[in-house]
Amino acid sequence: MYIQTQFASLLLLAGTSLASQVRKYNFTITSQWSSGDGHGRPVFMINGQSPGPLIEADEGDEIEVFVDNQLAAETTMHWHGIYQIDRPWNDGVPGVTQYSMQPRDTYTYRFTVQQQYGSYFYHGHFGPAFADGMRGPMWIAPAAWRPRPYELISDSSHDVEQMKKAEKHPFHVVISDWNAEPMDILLVMYRDTGIVPWCSNSIVLNGKGRTYCHSAELIESVGGPGRNTLGCLMQPDQELYSNEQVCEATQTDLEIFQAEEGHEWIWINFIHSGAHHELQISVDEHEIVVVAADGEFTYPQRVHAANCNLGERISILVHLNQKPGDYAIRVTSLRQEQVIQGLGILRYPGSSHGAQEAEPPATKPWVHLNGTLISDKLQQMDEMKLAPFPSRPPPPQSDHTLKFFVNMTGTGSWALNIGPHQAFRQQLPPLLWEEDSRGVTTYESDVQGGSMQNGSVVDIIFTNGANVNSQHPFHKHNNKAWVIGTGTGGFPWDTVDEAIQQGGMADSFNFVDPPIRDGCRLGNTTGDWTVIRYDIAFPAASMLHCHMIHHFGAGQQVVLLEGVESMAKIPAEMKDRVHSNFRPPLRYGPLD
């Protein structure tokens, strides 16, 4: 078993710096009409805004969020990337860790932010609520004792101090693709017809954006033929089942990142809470320095563009070393299904523009409209080289191995191994304490039948199945994991050790400095594989799922029971909450 000696030593080093306070927030969730990108539609709001309010805390603080559900439907709130160390019932997953909040119901989430820092976010976890606006940013300020990688960026003490100043005043931007219709409507259409909801109206930054209508010639030159006026690839029989999608340009406000006087660097946290599109981040005429991923410091990468997948966070520093003025921040889709780009504005201190002026500046981009770099001399972020700073190698061996074969098992049905995680399970008594709610998508043991005990190390091997040509951005609740290997051609071995000893695959794995994330990417091609390794540091019922909305909604989810032999007693008030007495339907499948 692997003991978290590194975390323990860091906590001892912190000493009295972990004196904490309680950060209290009140959230009221409503559905309101909104037109952030110029097209009106119902949106889930938190305190009248989407994204919701920023939650800020220091390491060691307790966060308390009172949530008032004023919707006509059930809901929960998940704290994406946050370790639910002491109170696993506050992870916000209906049917797994809690009963959902009924309409006009309330619930208070309480958790302590321990052993982590940086950029996170919260979002609804009942159905596709996060894709319809129920989301917001979180920032856990890194403790003063934590090492920073700034001296690897510049040997100037002045620059290093400016980077520290930027870190203390970060910008937070929730980025996402944005559809013309509510996502539950689009998912029902997907279930019945197989038409994927990939055609977005806009890419929004903090809920702001525009629909840009490009010429057919430009769209075809960067994306190829067979596209509509929104740049979307048309799907077979799409015109029979979905509303016609015609590009209608809008002129709404853009998000402005106004640098303060005296600041020579700025820090921006990009938080991807979208539904379908992987996004490419770039700032016109500026190199960007990637300094953190999924909250934690990394060895810096100085690049011209950085990709950010669904559920991920990428934190960058930008040196304000160009002529003062406005520069476009571009967030561009990397998915082949649609040619689409969103814009924000980086504004230098003392810019002559008025505070409300938000026209896209005519600055030089680093990327084409399809997200590719305009020159092979430019640098793209390499996500597999985002090594943690300071170095934190993974455990050398694992105690358990789980293997998941990703496959499409029918129209509108995705599975990890045996079958989809049915949507009705979010209305069952939570499986955290109710064993009868645990189905074939609940995993209590590894491939050898051993239970995953507290303190043990787990490998998860993902393999892309037959007839699958779509990538999968997975998210692991409650743990960060080292992404120790990726490859092609399938993974026929039962364990990583077998792959190395019997398959000669040693060069396919990194046990020295792999990235550590709360998710991973499984490649697009049949036979692609990814292996992650993590340690079970506290008991939990942890969901593992694809964050692409139609995969998530169509059942590509499992629940892992980790360290449950050490589980704290579930409070009686969790079990006694008002809830629906639900009997599963006869139909077996997602979105029931």
Swiss-Prot record:
Gene Ontology molecular function terms on file: copper ion binding; oxidoreductase activity
Chain sites annotated for binding Cu cation 3: 125
Broadest EC class assigned to this enzyme: oxidoreductase
Compartments reported by the entry: Cell surface
Annotated SUPFAM superfamilies: Cupredoxins (SSF49503)
Binding site for Cu cation 2: 80, 123
Purpose of the protein: Laccase involved the biosynthesis of dihydroxynaphthalene (DHN)-melanin, a bluish-green pigment forming a dark layer in the conidial wall that protects the conidia from UV radiations. The first step of the pathway is the production of the pentaketide 1,3,6,8-tetrahydroxynaphthalene (1,3,6,8-THN or T4HN) by the polyketide synthase PfmaE though condensation of acetyl-CoA with malonyl-CoA. T4HN is not stable and easily oxidizes into the stable form flaviolin. T4HN is also substrate of the hydroxynaphthalene reductase PfmaG to yield scytalone.
Annotated GO biological process: melanin biosynthetic process
Predominant place of localization: other
UniProt name for this protein: Laccase PFICI_06862
Source species: Pestalotiopsis fici (strain W106-1 / CGMCC3.15140)
Positions bound to Cu cation 4: 475
